[in-house]
């Protein structure tokens, strides 16, 4: 066991050949293995893009924005780190080129460089090394994932900085792991190592000799091929590992352990640690692969359905809900813009309906139709952030009779702004980092479904929004049966809603950011449980005829 007071050791994870190989999952899985050996692990993601953070980037370009407790908008890989380990991510666990340059330029403006010419080397690289050391926070191991692909011009300052780190901290305190692709060429009937050889060659030209290679492949790489890779890449044969495609991401730590990766890391770092205790990972994988209660279909009604990375934490939180109920969750992505054409047949095929967060008016009328279908057919419903607001608008129009009810985000002239801009957001013009972000308290009402699911009176959840329920309409909604089950105790802001007599729950926050495979979030566990009960009830009766609901202008 590494004792406190010893130097932090650094594992640098780079990627080559193609993007989206799974560096984030590999880094998270390594963190899980090392943590299960009794080591304290922290993570850092370095992103080469010039945006200060991903908060203003399109989900189609970047995927999900993961929000931390301290209100940072970060890369989705931080979600993997939190789900796979006990480490808590903060804004210091994700840096971009833009943020690094911003720090350096601010120092230059303050005159901290004493009249020197500010350059990429040493000033930018020194700043990168400083944030690496800060992220360690006294942990035994800091795993640093460098985004992008080796060879990208944007990555060069980060690669130069991590090259220097080995000389700053010593050979035994820095290890380089390189993730590459070993593709199987069907026409030739064999695996090809040349892409890996060229990727490592490019990395070595930068001055980094990888200590170990993770070779992504859809099949086991034979020993003789690993020896060939080792020979051409100047790596010890025992340091070439198959990063095998597996059915569940929660099987990746077990797969890498079977390859002996964590033992090799202990050897390279020259540390002693206990054998990893992976029984709970084995249990999770068994529950994912062999659910006793079968399959349940959850319909996700959104507009980013073509890119599942847009809802990464949400998708995983639903899987966790399935684990909690010993069921397999099958996700059905339903394009809300297509629902606006009037055909709701896709909604009939699912056991529960979820409307996730989002921004912008496109697809909102389809989401409202999804809410209406769930309410009228008593299909379990879960609305998150914008999903809660869609539920409020749907009920205002179709139950309270408030024609034209809407959110001020979508219609500034609406006669009934049941969703309004938060007081603290009025006058805010900048887009980046200015929303209500991070963890805030939510007081739960006694006797409600929310209180029963959480088993607590007060919870803290992560937020990312500018708009809120308009409390001027609260009495009308309560008279119509809506229960405001969660409220911010400081501002009186509505955090949770529900309807009695069915599983119809909405929350203004993002509970998916706090769910883990070993600790499924109670709202997702309860939602999947309700979906299973609805599935079982539907199987006992003949299917109802699908209704087509007309789409009107704003209602």
Swiss-Prot record:
- The protein here is known as CTP synthase
Q: Which residues form the active site?
A: 385, 510, 512
The UniProt annotation places ATP binding at: 20-25, 77
Positions of the region Disordered? Answer: 535-555
The family classification in the record reads: Belongs to the CTP synthase family.
Give the catalysed reaction(s), semicolon-separated.
UTP + L-glutamine + ATP + H2O = CTP + L-glutamate + ADP + phosphate + 2 H(+); L-glutamine + H2O = L-glutamate + NH4(+); UTP + NH4(+) + ATP = CTP + ADP + phosphate + 2 H(+)
Q: What is its EC number?
A: 6.3.4.2
Q: Please name the pathway.
A: Pyrimidine metabolism; CTP biosynthesis via de novo pathway; CTP from UDP: step 2/2
Glutamine amidotransferase type-1 domain: residues covered: 297-537
Which residues are involved in binding UTP?
19, 192-197, 228
Q: What else is known?
A: CTPSs have evolved a hybrid strategy for distinguishing between UTP and CTP. The overlapping regions of the product feedback inhibitory and substrate sites recognize a common feature in both compounds, the triphosphate moiety. To differentiate isosteric substrate and product pyrimidine rings, an additional pocket far from the expected kinase/ligase catalytic site, specifically recognizes the cytosine and ribose portions of the product inhibitor.
Assembly and oligomerization? Homotetramer.
What SUPFAM superfamilies does the entry give? Class I glutamine amidotransferase-like, P-loop containing nucleoside triphosphate hydrolases
Q: Which GO terms describe its molecular function?
A: ATP binding; CTP synthase activity; glutaminase activity; identical protein binding; metal ion binding
Q: Which gene encodes it?
A: pyrG
- Where Mg(2+) binds, per the record, is at 77, 145
């Amino acid at each position: 066991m590494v004792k406190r007071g010893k130097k932090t050791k650094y594992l640098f994870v780079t990627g080559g050949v193609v993007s989206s190989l799974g560096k984030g999952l590999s880094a998270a899985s390594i963190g899980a293995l090392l943590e299960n050996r009794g080591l304290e692990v922290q993570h850092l993601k370095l992103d080469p893009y010039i945006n200060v953070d991903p908060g203003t980037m399109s989900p189609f370009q970047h995927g999900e924005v993961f929000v931390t407790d301290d209100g940072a908008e970060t890369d989705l890989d931080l979600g993997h780190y939190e789900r796979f380990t006990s480490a808590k991510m903060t804004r210091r666990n994700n840096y971009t080129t833009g943020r690094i340059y911003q720090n350096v330029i601010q120092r230059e403006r303050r005159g901290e460089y004493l009249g020197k010419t500010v350059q990429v080397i040493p000033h930018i690289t020194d700043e990168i090394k400083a944030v690496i050391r800060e992220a360690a926070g006294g942990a035994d191991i800091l795993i640093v994932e460098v985004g992008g692909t080796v060879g990208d011009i944007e990555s060069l300052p980060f690669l130069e900085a991590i090259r220097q780190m080995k000389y700053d901290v010593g050979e035994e305190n820095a290890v380089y792991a390189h993730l590459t692709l070993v593709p199987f060429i069907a026409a030739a009937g064999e695996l090809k190592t040349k892409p890996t050889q060229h990727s490592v060659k490019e990395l070595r030209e930068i001055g980094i000799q990888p200590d170990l290679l993770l070779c992504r492949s859809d099949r086991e790489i034979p020993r003789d091929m690993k020896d060939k890779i080792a020979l051409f890449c100047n790596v010890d044969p025992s340091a070439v590992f198959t990063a095998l495609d597996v059915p569940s991401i929660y099987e990746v730590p077990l797969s890498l352990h079977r390859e002996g990766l964590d033992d090799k890391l202990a050897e390279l770092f020259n540390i002693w640690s206990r054998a990893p205790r992976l029984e709970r990972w084995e249990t999770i994988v068994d529950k994912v692969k062999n659910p006793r209660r079968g399959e349940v279909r959850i319909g996700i009604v959104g507009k980013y359905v073509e890119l599942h990375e847009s809802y990464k934490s949400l998708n995983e939180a639903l899987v966790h809900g399935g684990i909690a109920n010993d069921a397999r969750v099958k996700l059905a992505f339903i394009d809300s813009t297509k629902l606006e054409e009037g055909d709701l047949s896709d909604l009939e095929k699912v056991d529960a309906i979820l409307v996730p967060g989002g921004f912008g008016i496109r697809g909102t009328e389809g989401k409202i139709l999804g809410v209406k279908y769930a309410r009228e057919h008593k299909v379990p419903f879960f609305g998150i952030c914008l999903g809660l607001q869609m539920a409020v608008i749907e009920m205002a129009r179709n139950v309270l009779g408030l024609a034209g009810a809407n959110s001020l985000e979508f219609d500034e002239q609406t006669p009934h702004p049941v969703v309004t801009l938060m007081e603290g957001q009025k006058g805010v013009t900048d887009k980046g980092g200015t929303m209500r972000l991070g963890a805030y308290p939510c007081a739960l009402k006694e006797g409600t479904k929310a209180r029963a699911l959480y088993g607590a009176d007060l919870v803290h959840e992560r937020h990312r929004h500018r708009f809120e329920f308009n409390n001027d309409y609260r009495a009308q909604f309560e008279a119509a049966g809506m229960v405001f089950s969660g409220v911010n105790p400081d501002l009186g802001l509505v955090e949770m809603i529900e309807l009695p007599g069915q599983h119809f729950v909405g929350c203004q926050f993002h509970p998916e950011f706090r769910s883990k495979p070993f600790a499924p979030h109670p709202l997702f566990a309860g939602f999947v449980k309700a979906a299973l009960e609805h599935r079982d009830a539907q199987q006992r009766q003949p299917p109802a005829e699908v209704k087509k609901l007309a789409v009107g202008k704003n209602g």
